[in-house]
Amino acid sequence: MDIQLKTGCFDDAALVRRVVFMDEQGYENEFDAIDEDPNCIHVTLYVDGELAGCSRVFPEELERVADAEAPLLPACDMDEGVAAGETYIMGRVAVLSTMRRRGLASKIIEASEAAARDAGAKLI
């Protein structure tokens, strides 16, 4: 099983999210303004060249783009000592049903954490 991880492939991430969250789980609209922000990192995973899953990770401040009521830093005790812009939120982790039960979600999470840290995250 050849696994490839990429960042910046929003169209592929959108496809996975549409299938998993909208078609399978029935959410009406899976997308928001955060998806379009250049600071939002979309991670996609491929198995033997075939799209299998995705996630997104972004600076906490972007959450207020979608929700003006989102909490301000520090949101929890773990945030103490972490500067604005150093807390990232990971979400929208999804794996296509045909690719599940292979440990792929954990690989997506690991890649998302690495991408966030590369972007300056200290707390995810």
Language model region names:
Residues 1-13:
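A short beta-loop-alpha structural element at the N-terminal edge
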Residues 7, 33, 58-61, 81, ...:
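OB-fold and OB-like single-stranded nucleic-acid-recognition modules
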Residues 18-52, 56, 62:
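Active-site rim helix/loop that mediates acceptor-substrate recognition in acyltransferases
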Residues 44, 50-60, 65-78, 87-94:
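Conserved beta-strand in the GNAT
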Residues 95, 101-114:
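Conserved acetyl-CoA-binding loop-helix of GNAT-fold acetyltransferases
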